[in-house]
């Protein structure tokens, strides 16, 4: 979405776009134990005379917003910065407490929160159960969240001007404090679209 004038905005007037980090729009959601957070974003373009539709090569009939997971796999002998998060197959997240280079073999990942794991010249700390994209639901209305999904179909053609409200509900099932704020794992992406002047 970084190259489009159509973006996710924090306000209906489209004055505050979601911040972009590493080419991906980021919305920080932090949980204080098991809870759900509901909110609304706005998808649109404030640039006059723009139109969005799907690319001719797409098999989709409509633009779609899709909840997706970033690749957070551990990689051997890789340089990492402090704050980087990995998500191995054990269902937990680990944040690098210092920069360095990972080791040649996969470390033994502790499932105890706040436990440190040495790995090459870096150190990982267990920060809790991993987020799962299935815990994020999208809908075109707040009432639609009860049957929301991780994919939302938008109109076939979207004109700039009035934004489309995109409601979201994020559910945290873990009792611990959780945040992937330094290195987001879950994101919203768009399918193959094309923007043009009209």
Give, region by region, the residue ranges found by the protein language model.
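Short, surface-exposed ligand- or partner-binding patches at beta-edge/loop junctions that are enriched
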Residues: 55-61, 183-188
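Tryptophan-rich substrate-binding surfaces of secreted polymer-degrading and adhesive proteins
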Residues: 69-130
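Beta-sheet-dominated interaction scaffolds and their linkers
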Residues: 4-50, 56-60, 68-71
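Beta-strand elements of well-folded, non-transmembrane domains
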Residues: 45-47, 170-174, 188-196
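Short, solvent-exposed loop/turn segments enriched in Ser/Thr/Gly
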Residues: 20-23, 33-40, 162-166, 177-188
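Signature of Gram-negative chaperone-usher
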Residues: 9-18, 60-69, 129-179, 196-198
């Amino acid at each position: 979405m970084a190259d489009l004038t159509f973006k996710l905005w924090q306000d209906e007037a489209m004055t505050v776009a979601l911040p972009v980090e590493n080419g991906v729009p980021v919305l920080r959601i932090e949980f204080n134990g098991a809870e759900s957070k509901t909110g609304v974003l706005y998808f649109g373009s404030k640039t006059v005379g723009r139109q969005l539709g799907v690319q001719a090569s797409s098999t989709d009939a409509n633009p779609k917003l899709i909840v997706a997971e970033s690749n957070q796999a551990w990689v051997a002998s890789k340089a990492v910065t402090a704050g980087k998060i990995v998500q191995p197959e054990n269902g937990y997240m680990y944040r690098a407490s210092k920069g360095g280079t990972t080791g040649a073999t996969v470390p033994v990942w502790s499932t105890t929160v706040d436990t440190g794991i040495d790995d090459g010249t870096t150190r990982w700390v267990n920060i809790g159960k991993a987020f799962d994209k299935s815990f994020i639901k999208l809908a075109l209305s707040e009432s639609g969240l009860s049957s929301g999904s991780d994919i939302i179909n938008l109109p076939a053609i979207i004109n700039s001007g009035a934004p489309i409200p995109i409601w979201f509900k994020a559910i945290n099932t873990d009792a611990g404090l959780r945040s992937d704020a330094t290195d987001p794992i879950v994101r919203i992406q768009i399918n193959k679209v094309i923007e043009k002047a009209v």
